[in-house]
């Protein structure tokens, strides 16, 4: 389907059309009439089809809240109330790419598949996850994905771990075998990433 500037289509208005010889295709930018959301449509003959919903997320501080939200919204939604839809999709879909990414200024949720129906299914799950996440009803999701205190852990572990300048308080149980430790999916992911010397070289 060839689109022309100012053409109306399913609640969108075509703003620009540009030939892209590098990918033997055409790029279209459309604006959603009601919300103002922008849609970039790349048309070419590639058998692999992709979809992504993305948001500008410039941070106000270094708490990593957008990275935590990226993980949190993929922990169930109104339409798909399963604990880990992302993991289920990895196992059951014909996807060729499935991920979510937080950059310094944006957060993206891209998917790809060579099967048209599979792509629509993936887009349906991702759109519901992003627009209707279970995090609104289950605060524990945010705490699980971000950071939280847990009683337990290795007493030999470092006592100096910190988040937002707050040192972890070391406590022991009555038998002296456990202490209060920080845990969380994104917390541990970033701790691992930032402990790699190559990340700062």
Where do the model's predicted regions map?
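Short, glycine/acidic-rich hinge or "gate" loops at secondary-structure transitions
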Residues: 138-148
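N- or domain-start disorder-to-order transition segments that initiate the globular core
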Residues: 2-46
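M16/MPP (pitrilysin/insulinase) zinc-metallopeptidase core fold and M16-derived inactive scaffolds
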Residues: 25, 43-128, 132-140, 195-197
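A general structural signal for short secondary-structure junctions and capping/turn motifs
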Residues: 20, 30-31, 43, 89, ...
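Short alpha-helical segments and helix-capping/turn motifs at coil-helix boundaries
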Residues: 37-38, 93-94, 187-188
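Generic N-terminal segment detector
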Residues: 3-6, 94-95, 161, 166
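Scaffold signal of the M16-like zinc-metallopeptidase fold and its non-catalytic homologs
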Residues: 76-78, 122-136, 155-201
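Positively charged, phosphate-engaging catalytic surfaces used for nucleic-acid and nucleotide handling
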Residues: 151
């Amino acid at each position: 389907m060839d689109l022309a500037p100012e053409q109306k289509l399913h609640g969108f208005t075509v703003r620009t059309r540009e030939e892209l010889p590098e990918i033997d295709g055409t790029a279209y930018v459309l604006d959603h009439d009601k919300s103002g959301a922008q849609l970039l449509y790349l048309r070419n003959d590639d058998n692999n089809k992709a979809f992504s919903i993305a948001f500008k997320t410039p941070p106000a501080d270094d708490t990593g809240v957008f990275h935590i939200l990226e993980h949190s919204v993929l922990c169930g939604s109104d339409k798909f109330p399963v604990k880990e839809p992302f993991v289920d999709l990895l196992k059951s879909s014909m996807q060729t790419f499935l991920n979510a990414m937080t950059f310094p200024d944006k957060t993206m949720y891209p998917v790809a598949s060579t099967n048209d129906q599979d792509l629509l299914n993936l887009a349906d799950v991702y759109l519901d996850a992003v627009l209707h996440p279970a995090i609104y009803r289950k605060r524990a999701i945010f705490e699980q994905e971000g950071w939280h205190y847990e009683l337990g852990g290795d007493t030999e572990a470092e006592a100096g771990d910190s988040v937002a300048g707050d040192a972890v308080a070391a406590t022991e149980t009555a038998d002296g075998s456990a202490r209060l430790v920080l845990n969380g999916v994104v917390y541990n992911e970033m701790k691992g990433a930032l402990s790699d010397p190559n990340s700062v070289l």
